[in-house]
From Swiss-Prot:
Cofactor: FAD
Entry keyword Iron-sulfur: no
GO cellular component, one term: cytosol
GO biological process, one term: tRNA methylation
Domain of life: Bacteria
S-S bridge residues: none
Molecular-function annotations in GO: flavin adenine dinucleotide binding; tRNA (uracil(54)-C5)-methyltransferase activity, 5,10-methylenetetrahydrofolate-dependent
Similarity comment: Belongs to the MnmG family. TrmFO subfamily.
Phylogenetic lineage: Bacteria, Pseudomonadati, Pseudomonadota, Alphaproteobacteria, Caulobacterales
The name this protein goes by in its record: Methylenetetrahydrofolate--tRNA-(uracil-5-)-methyltransferase TrmFO
Provenance organism: Caulobacter sp. (strain K31)
Gene: trmFO
E.C. designation(s): 2.1.1.74
Length: 480
């Protein structure tokens, strides 16, 4: 008499952001049931209340899965010469839900992969809801998960609820680490003066969709730039007393903080004028240029690239309307500020992203100390695959460190401790970059046998590292 196979117990994923959604997808695709817990929800009207009660975080505006808060860009899609583009390529090979939805809902952005936020989130939500092995529970997990949840992926992101954050910190015995995260304004395109601004991508570089004019550019002469910097420095900022000693992450600095570091900082950063030519005055180079990037598929909303800010809302409208072309700007959303929280992963996590003192808990996303949408989703992809393999009684090692995925694992689980001998005593969030991968010899001769010019050898080295990464990932996948 045959007996039915014992049903596989579900894995619980806490958090429906990019990391949690990716983790849930990877687990379910491996044939393991998942319960995805997301605290953002709409509650029925209570007696006497008008309309539904919305449960949100300080930064989220919807209850959609994988809502993108800070920007709509997944950054460069160039796998040969850019580390985040390489990470895109690796994740596509591994059936990433986030990259698939991003590809489906991309908007023009030069060489970057940017998406229509609403369409992207709706697509992720639709696929998760439609998967037969995924159940969504709209509820907050307060405190540590119940003990009978024997496999949990914690992907609660930078805005982890206080109850869960406190429970994790008590369990770990570590102090909380945090940094500011700021949001850039979004503008209605019809309010941009295109008699002043123009469409062009830097160096006319084409993006995945073939558009070489994916940005709106607003030029400034020196006098306009100096006046703008003065107003930026003098404008009233939002104060957060409890966060005064929290460090900023350099990859998402508020624009006024960059200006405080030096008056020329912005024109060598997000306002750099290189690679752009004003068609109305092609012989005169702008002193600085503000760029806007398409934010939705309709092309009606555009975000100010690199203009995350903690200026008070009234000051934002006044200061940003000083920018030529934006003098009549109508803002669909003004910038804002929220706190980001992450754990001391090198001390707390093993190489399969499990908590050493509580192996039933895995972590993914920004809480692990990666920075950026793609990096967060990548750790969700790995945590999901690790958890599914464990549930199925298999062993799955991390990808080799020569891959972008493996390099991220190395960063969050070991790079910090190695650096302590050099006096680096604080673990900080990190974007993917070639510096996290083991170096290769710098090539001197190309595939065609021709000597590579000295100034091009750096790019050639990046391409070699990318080719090595994809080959090593293929080998890892074959043995997984």
């Amino acid at each position: 008499m045959s007996t039915s196979p014992k049903p596989v117990a579900p894995i619980h994923v806490i958090g429906g952001g990019l990391a949690g959604s990716e983790a849930a997808w990877q687990i379910a695709q491996a044939g393991v049931p998942v319960v995805l817990h997301e605290m953002r929800r709409d509650l029925p009207s209570s007696s006497g209340a008008v309309g539904p009660t919305k449960v949100r975080t300080d930064a989220h505006q919807t209850d959609g899965l994988a809502e993108m808060v800070c920007s709509n860009s997944f950054r460069s899609d160039d796998w040969q010469f850019n580390a985040v583009g390489l990470l895109h390529a690796e994740m596509r090979k591994l059936d990433s839900l986030i990259l698939s939805a991003a590809d489906q809902h991309q908007v023009p952005a030069g060489g970057a992969l940017a998406v229509d936020r609403d369409g992207f989130s709706a697509e992720v939500t639709r696929r998760i809801e439609a998967h037969p092995l995924i159940t969504i529970e709209r509820e907050e997990v307060a405190g540590l998960p119940p003990e009978d949840w024997d496999s949990v992926v914690v992907a609660t992101g930078p805005l982890t609820s206080p109850a869960l954050a406190d429970a994790i910190l008590e369990l770990s015995g570590e102090g909380q680490l945090s940094f500011f995260d700021a949001i850039a304004p979004i503008i209605h395109v019809e309010s941009i003066d295109m008699d002043i601004a123009w469409r062009q991508s830097r160096y006319d570089k084409e993006g995945p969709g073939g558009d070489a004019a994916a940005y709106i550019n607003c030029p400034m002469n020196k006098a306009q730039y100096e006046a703008f910097i003065d107003a930026l420095l003098e404008g009233p900022k939002a104060e957060f007393k409890d966060w005064e000693h929290v460090p900023y992450f350099d990859g998402c600095l508020p624009i006024e903080v960059m200006a405080e570091r030096g008056r020329e900082t912005l024109r060598h950063g997000p306002m750099k004028p290189v690679g752009l030519t004003n068609p109305r005055d092609p012989t005169v180079k702008a002193y600085a240029i503000v760029q806007l990037r398409q934010d939705n598929a309709l092309g009606t909303l555009w975000n100010m690239v690199g203009f995350q800010t903690k200026l008070k809302h009234g000051a934002q409208a006044e200061v940003f309307r000083m920018i030529p072309g934006l003098q009549n700007a109508q803002f669909a959303r003004l910038g804002g500020l929220h706190r980001n929280t992450f754990i001391n992963s090198p001390r707390l996590l093993d190489r399969s992203l499990r908590m050493k003192v509580a192996p039933r808990l895995r972590f993914a996303g920004q809480m692990t100390g990666v920075e950026g949408y793609v990096e967060s989703a990548a750790t969700g992809l790995l945590a999901g695959r690790f958890a599914a393999a464990e549930r199925l009684g298999k062993t799955l090692d991390a990808p080799p460190p020569t891959t972008a995925l493996g390099a991220l694992v190395d960063h969050v689980t070991g790079g910090h401790i190695e650096g302590e001998a050099l006096g680096k005593t604080s673990f900080q969030p990190m974007n993917i970059n070639y510096g996290l991968l083991p170096p290769t010899e710098t090539p001197k001769v190309g595939d065609d046998g021709v000597k590579i010019p000295m100034k091009e050898r750096g790019r050639a080295k990046k391409r070699l590292m990318s080719l090595r990464a994809l080959a090593d990932l293929d080998q890892w996948m074959a043995g997984a």
